Structures are given as structure tokens and as C-alpha cells.
């Protein structure tokens, strides 16, 4: 039904489409599409950081190599570590790090980096040789020989491995270890390194160490001079050259080399200690004390450094100062700055010298109660050392003289018999 004129009419009139409106809409859509594709794509999103270009791993390696060539080893190590982060599957970065770790005396880190290289390729003879070298410098001679021999089994022409093996044999001999024919083995390994690569740093270094061990000091000087010429940025090489200059009585040259080691590694007390000993030998005790104190400031908990300073004080007739330092070396204790020092076990060589001079300094300052205990320890513990026996007896003579004069610090001042001395319990240093 259709009701004409009713307001309820269900059929509505259709509006005519405006053609101009359609054109405007189409144009607007086109503009939006153009804006989205050309303009909006260049506008950075809000609150999103601007992306930075990724640096190529090779650029880190190039930079690290330049730093290494300039002797900036700490910075080179840092940059090689960045190279590792950028490309953890490049064994060359790990091996470069291991070598620099060795040059800077960080042997534990060298072992870790050499092992990382081997995780990528367990037949890498260069990494195995470096690992063995690092073990040898750490004092683990069994592992050192094993790893280096593995490297040589893979590559029998690896000259550096023979050089490292020579070094390890020398360290074993210095420690009183190794097989009976170890010196012959060291000589054979050294000759092979020379035959394969006579002009490398590794060959000169290892041969210098071997010649020093066999007391061929002038020849050792030649080898270490050649090594330093190849790489003047390794502190250990300068110290080894300095030691051989001392052996050939070229003290000024020795001090110069030790000074270079100080410059290269200012946080290591060893070169300053070596300088102090040269001045001590020359009788320049003021300079010897200066350098010994500089070394001690770097490692105040080291009993050997306290002993070294104590010996110089003794020779400079500063007896009370000598007692203070040697007591820390022998018995241990706490420095005035509150640093704990652990005493050294009595032994031959330099530690035995600390004990002997400590006893003499105690007697010289009328502290015979303790002096006689130390003399007893020396007489019993160093009975195969004639100088030690003489010094122990000298302590007794000094204290006898004080006792006869009535000024010894003993409860009962009586003469002392050497037989009685040998029956007393040995004194052990207390921590």
C-alpha cells in the first residue's frame, strides 16, 4: 500500500551525486598516498633511537694492529676484545690477544684466549704453541710441554713452538725440575728454532734465556739486543737484557734497560727492584733505597720486597730500619699503613740471606733474645751453606760480647755454646 502525501512514505528520494566532490576526494587520496610514500618515510619515528652503522670487525683488527705496533698494548688488547665481540668466530683475534697477554704478564688471560682459539679449531698449531708457552710462564711445565708437543705433531716446522719449548725447559731448570737430560733437550730445541727461523723475536728471546742459564752472558746479550731491536715494547725483554748487562758488569747499561722496563710497565715492582740491586752493588745506597721503596709502594704486601729494602738498610748501617723490614720478610706482620704481610719460609739463596741479616741486625741492636732464635734457625735449616753457618756463629759471638758486657737483653746473660744452639727447635716464620 502506498499512501500518497503521507510522512510515512518508505521510499526516500535519491540524491544526485556531485561530480566535483568526487574529483576532490580522489585528489585528496592521491595526495595522501604521495605523502606516505615520499615524505613520511623520511621522518624518524618518535622515541626511537637513530640507528648507527655497524662497524666491520676488520676495522677493529686493523686499529688493534696499529696500536700494537706503537707499543700501546693495553689499548690494543681493548680493541682486539672489541673485534672478538664483533666477530667471535675469528681465531686470529684470540691468538693476538693471547700473545699480548703474555707480553703484559697476564698469563691466565693468555691461556683463556688461546683456548678460545682452539675451540674454533683444535688443530691450530699456533694456538697450541701459544697455550703451551702461557702454561710454561705460569709454572705448569707438564701442560706446557704437552701443548707445545701437540703443536709440533701438527706442524713440525713451527719454529716458534721450538722456541717456546726451549723457554719451558729453561724455566724447569731454574725451578730445579725436569728430566736429567733436560739441558740437552733445551739445546736441541733451540738449535731447531735457529735452523727454521734464525731472525725471529721468539728465537732470539729463547736462545738468550738458554745462554744466560749456561752462563754465556756475552752471547746472551747479543741475542737479547737483537730481540729488543725487533720489538722494543716488551718490558720483560729489557729486564732480561739488563740482567745480562749486570752479569757482564755493564751496570749503566743495565740501569738503562731496567728504566725502559719501568716506563713500559710502571705497575710492576720488578724493574725498580732490579735497579735498586744494581745501585746496592755499586755502593750507592741512597739511590738503592729510593728504588726499593718505589717497588715496595707498588706491592706493600710482598715480603721479598721488604727483605730487599731491609738488606739495603743493613748495608747503609740503618740497623733499626733493617730490623723493621726484615722482620716483616721473615716473620710477617702488618705494615704501619695496615697492610698484612706473610712471612717467608726459611730457604736457601735470597730468603736465607734475609734470615741471616735479620739475625745480625737483631744482635747489632741488642735484641739477642730473638737474634739467637734466628741464628738457631739458620744453623739448622741452612747447614749446607758455609756463609750461613758463619753468620749464625757471628750472631752468637756478638751476643756473647753483649752478655759479657752486661748489656744483653737476655734474662740470664751467659755464654752460648754452639752445641746448645743446634738442639733448639727451629723457628718458623709466623704469618
Give the location of each predicted region.
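Long, contiguous interaction/recruitment modules in multidomain scaffold/adaptor proteins
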Residues: 1-55, 141, 146-170, 175, ...
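Terminal, low-structured helical/coil segments at or just beyond the last alpha-helical repeat
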Residues: 19, 45-48, 335-431
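Alpha-helical segment of the N-proximal tetratricopeptide repeat
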Residues: 53-106, 137, 171-179, 202, ...
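Structural signature of alpha-solenoid helical repeat junctions
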Residues: 55, 89, 123, 157, ...
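Helix-start (N-cap) detector for alpha-helical repeat units in TPR-like alpha-solenoids
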Residues: 57, 91-92, 125-129, 159-160, ...
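Structural signature of tandem alpha-helical TPR/SEL1-like repeats
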Residues: 71-78, 104-116, 138-150, 173-192, ...
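Structural marker of alpha-solenoid helical repeat scaffolds
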Residues: 86, 120, 154, 196, ...
Amino acid at each position: 500500500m502506498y499512501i500518497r502525501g503521507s510522512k510515512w512514505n518508505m521510499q526516500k528520494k535519491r540524491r544526485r551525486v556531485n561530480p566535483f566532490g568526487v574529483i576532490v576526494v580522489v585528489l585528496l587520496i592521491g595526495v595522501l598516498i604521495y605523502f606516505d610514500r615520499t615524505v613520511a618515510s623520511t621522518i624518524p619515528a618518535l622515541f626511537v633511537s637513530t640507528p648507527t652503522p655497524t662497524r666491520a670487525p676488520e676495522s677493529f683488527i686493523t686499529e688493534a694492529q696499529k696500536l700494537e705496533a706503537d707499543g700501546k698494548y693495553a689499548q690494543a688488547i681493548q680493541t682486539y676484545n672489541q673485534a672478538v665481540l664483533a666477530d667471535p668466530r675469528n681465531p686470529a683475534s684470540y691468538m693476538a690477544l693471547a700473545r699480548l697477554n703474555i707480553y703484559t704478564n697476564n698469563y691466565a688471560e693468555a691461556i683463556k684466549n688461546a683456548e678460545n682459539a682452539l675451540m674454533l679449531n683444535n688443530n691450530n698449531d699456533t694456538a697450541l704453541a701459544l697455550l703451551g708457552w702461557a702454561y710454561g710462564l705460569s709454572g705448569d711445565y707438564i701442560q706446557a710441554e704437552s701443548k707445545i708437543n701437540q703443536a709440533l705433531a701438527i706442524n713440525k716446522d713451527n719454529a716458534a713452538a721450538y722456541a717456546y719449548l726451549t723457554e719451558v725447559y729453561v724455566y724447569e731448570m731454574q725451578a730445579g725440575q725436569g728430566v736429567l737430560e733436560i739441558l740437552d733437550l733445551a739445546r736441541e730445541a733451540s738449535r731447531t728454532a735457529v735452523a727454521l727461523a734464525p731472525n725471529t723475536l721468539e728465537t732470539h728471546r729463547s736462545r738468550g734465556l738458554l745462554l744466560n742459564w749456561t752462563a754465556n752472558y756475552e752471547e746472551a746479550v747479543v741475542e737479547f739486543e737483537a730481540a729488543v731491536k725487533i720489538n722494543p715494547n716488551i718490558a720483560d725483554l729489557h729486564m732480561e737484557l739488563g740482567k745480562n748487562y749486570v752479569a757482564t758488569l755493564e751496570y749503566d747499561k743495565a740501569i738503562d734497560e731496567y728504566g725502559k722496563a719501568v716506563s713500559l710497565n710502571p705497575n710492576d715492582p720488578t724493574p725498580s727492584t732490579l735497579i735498586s740491586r744494581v745501585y746496592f752493588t755499586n755502593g750507592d745506597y741512597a739511590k738503592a733505597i729510593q728504588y726499593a721503596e718505589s717497588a715496595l709502594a707498588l706491592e706493600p704486601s710482598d715480603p721479598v720486597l721488604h727483605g730487599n729494602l731491609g738488606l739495603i738498610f743493613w748495608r747503609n748501617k740503618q740497623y733499626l730500619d733493617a730490623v723493621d723490614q726484615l722482620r716483616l720478610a721473615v716473620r710477617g706482620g702488618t705494615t704501619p699503613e695496615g697492610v698484612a704481610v706473610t712471612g717467608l719460609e726459611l730457604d736457601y739463596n735470597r730468603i736465607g740471606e734475609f734470615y741471616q741479616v735479620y739475625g745480625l741486625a737483631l744482635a747489632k741492636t741488642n735484641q739477642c733474645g730473638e737474634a739467637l732464635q734466628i741464628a738457631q734457625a739458620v744453623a739448622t735449616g741452612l747447614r749446607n751453606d758455609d756463609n750461613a753457618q758463619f753468620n749464625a756463629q757471628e750472631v752468637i759471638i756478638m751476643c756473647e760480647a753483649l752478655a759479657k758486657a752486661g748489656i744483653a737483653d737476655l734474662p740470664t746473660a751467659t755464654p752460648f755454646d754452639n752445641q746448645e744452639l743446634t738442639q733448639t727447635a727451629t723457628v718458623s716464620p709466623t704469618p
